[in-house]
Amino acid sequence: MAIINMTDLDLTNKRVLIRQDLNVPVSDGMVTSDARLRASLPTIQLALDKGAAVMVMSHLGRPTEGEFNNEFSLQPVVDYLAKALKSPVRLATDYLDGVEANVGEVVVFENVRFNQGEGKNDEALSKKMAALCDVYVMDAFGTAHRAQASTHGVGMFAPIACAGPLLAQELDALGKALDNPARPMVAIVGGSKVSTKLTVLESLSGIVDQLVVGGGIANTFIAAAGFNVGKSLYEADLVDEAKRLVANARSRGGDIPVPTDVVVASEFSPTAAAKLVDVSQVSDTDMIFDIGPDSAEALAKIIETAGTIVWNGPVGVFEFDQFGKGTERIARAIADSKAFSIAGGGDTLAAVDKYNIADKVSYISTGGGAFLEFLEGKELPAVAMLEKRGA
C-alpha cells in the first residue's frame, strides 16, 4: 500500500488537520471512558513535537446533522485534552471559513456532524475543510469504513493526505493477521446472530484453518448439526447456510466445530441457575448461554497450537458470571498463546477488560464496524483515499 505516513513528513510550521476518533461517552459534561482519548494523545503530541500548528476534528454521538446541540459538543473532550497535553487547547465552533491556529497550540473543531453535508461526503464542505490545512492526517480507523466529508472528502482535496500513527498501526496489524498469516490460523467469531456476521464467516472460512463460532451464532450451527436448541436464540432460516459453511470448511481440510457440551438455563437473567448438559440432551425449555468445559478445553487446545488468532465476539453470555466460563477459558488460552493475536469488536474488548488480558493480546483493534468490514475483505473508503493520494 503506497500510503504516506505522518511520521515521515516534515511538519515544521505546517497547518496540520488530524481526523481522530474522539467519540467517547460523556455524562454531566465529563468524559466517562477515556480509552479513545488516551489512544489519540501520541499522534497530537507527535504533531506538536514536529513543530506544527495542530487542528483536530472528530464526531461525537449522533446529533441531527447541521444543527448545533450542546449535548454532543466536544467541549468535555477539549477539557480532557487540555489537562492531558502540556500545550494550550481550545475549541473552535465557527471554523469552516478560516481559523487561526498557531504553532504549539491545539485547536479542536466542534463536532463535525454539526456541519450540513458531513454524512453525504459533500464536496463543497470537503473543500472548505481541505482549505484549512497544509497536511490532512486520517487517524480514525473506527470511521475508516465511512465515506464522509471529514474522513474521505477532505483527504481528496487537501494538499497532502497521510495516515496517522494509530491508523498505520491498525492497518499493519490487520495486514499481518490476514494477508500473510502464520499458520495454523484460527478465527473465533461470536455474537448473537449469524445474519450480522454472515459475510465475515464466509470471508474467514476461506482463509482460516479453523473457524470457531460462539454465542447465538453457535446455536444455529448446533441446530444445523441436528441437535435440539430448545428456546435458544437461533436463526432457523440460516440453518442451511450454516451447513454450507461447514461443508466448505471441511472441503478445505478445516472445520467449524460444534460444542459437545453446553451450559443452559430456563431464563435469561443475572440470577438464572446454570446447568451443564451434553449437547444432545438440551430440552425443549432450555436456553443455551455458554459452551461447557469439555468444549472450552477442546477450543483452548486449538488456540494453543495456532500461529495467528483473530477474535471477534464472546462464546457465551459472559456478562453473567455463571455463563462466562467458556469465554474466560478462550480469553486465557489466547493470553497464553505465542501466536500473533488480534481482538476487535465492542463485546470482545469488554471481555478482554473483564479477564484483564489486554497486555497479552498482540493487537487490540479500536474499530468496531471498520474491523468487521476489513475482515469481510471490503475496501475501506478512507484507506482507498489514502492509497490514491499516496500513489
UniProtKB/Swiss-Prot annotation:
Q: Where does ATP bind?
A: 197, 319, 345-348
Could you tell me which SUPFAM superfamilies the record lists for this protein?
A: Phosphoglycerate kinase (SSF53748)
Which Pfam families does the annotation name? PGK (PF00162)
Membrane-spanning residues: none
The UniProt catalytic activity note for this protein reads: (2R)-3-phosphoglycerate + ATP = (2R)-3-phospho-glyceroyl phosphate + ADP
Gene3D superfamilies associated with the record: Phosphoglycerate kinase, N-terminal domain
Work out whether the entry's keyword set contains ATP-binding. Answer: yes
Cellular compartments per GO CC = cytosol
Which residues are the signal sequence here? Answer: none
Where, subcellularly, is it found?
Answer: Cytoplasm
Q: Which GO terms describe its biological process?
A: gluconeogenesis; glycolytic process
Q: Where does substrate bind?
A: 21-23, 36, 59-62, 113, 146
Source organism superkingdom: Bacteria
Pathway it acts in? Carbohydrate degradation; glycolysis; pyruvate from D-glyceraldehyde 3-phosphate: step 2/5
- Recorded family membership: Belongs to the phosphoglycerate kinase family.
Q: Which PANTHER family match?
A: PHOSPHOGLYCERATE KINASE (PTHR11406), PHOSPHOGLYCERATE KINASE 1, CHLOROPLASTIC-RELATED (PTHR11406:SF23)
Name used for this protein in its record: Phosphoglycerate kinase
Question: Which organism's genome codes for this protein?
Answer: Shewanella denitrificans (strain OS217 / ATCC BAA-1090 / DSM 15013)
Q: Source gene?
A: pgk
